[in-house]
Every structure is written in structure tokens, then in C-alpha cells.
Amino acid sequence: MTCQILIQIRSDIIKQKYITYWQHTIHHSKKLQFYCIFKHDYKISSYLDLIRNLTNRKDLVKIRISNHKLMIETGRYNQTPHNDRFCPVCNAGIIEDEFHFLLHCPKYSVPRENFYNQIQQNFVDFDQLSYTELITKLI
């Protein structure tokens, strides 16, 4: 075998080992539970090309990787028990996680409805999607 082929084989082995490590890490990390819902393959996500506005792209990345100020995340830093990380925005006694923020919090219902009205035409059976399917489509 040529040196080039050996280098390629070695590179493929290293890449596959890393992908296996990546899959194990995202599926066994509490911090990455939300990320696992929509990220299944080790490849560049299409939203990186679709969202041109840098601020919007950064905001979406922060939600996707749990680099945000929601209580589900900030509670980790100050050791608030998981079941006590309530939404300070609506004060409904509900854990403030990504699902609550994106889909349920009543304080965000108007912008959420405006957004849904804009995107509904892009999805078949939008109203029939489960919360997980909706998050997967939106994120």
C-alpha cells in the first residue's frame, strides 16, 4: 500500500473513533439532553448555511448547545436542584427548560404565535406535530 492510502485509513479510523466518542458523550450527558433531540448525525447542520444573520445564528446555537440563561442551565452553576429550576418569567411553577421557553411559556405566546404563523406554510401538518417533532423542525 502506498503511504497516502495508509494515511487515509488511519484518518478514517481516528474519525470513526471520534464519532463513537461524540455519540456516547451526547447520549450520556444531562447537559446535552436537549441537543440529543435533534442532533443525530456527526455532520454540519444545515441551519449554519440557512441563517445568514449572524446574531440570529448565534442565538440559535446558544439554545441548541444549552449556552443560555434559562434556569435549567443557570441552576447547574448555583446547584439549584433540577426540580426547583422554575421559570422566573411566568412564575407558573414550571421548570424553565428549552421546551418551556420555546413552546409553552405564556409570557412568550404573542411572539411565538407570530412566528408560527410565518412558518406554518413550510411544514405539512404543522398543527399535528408533537413537541419533539416541532423542536426538531424548528431547531
Enumerate the language-model features and the residues they cover:
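Family-specific functional microsites
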Residues: C3-I139
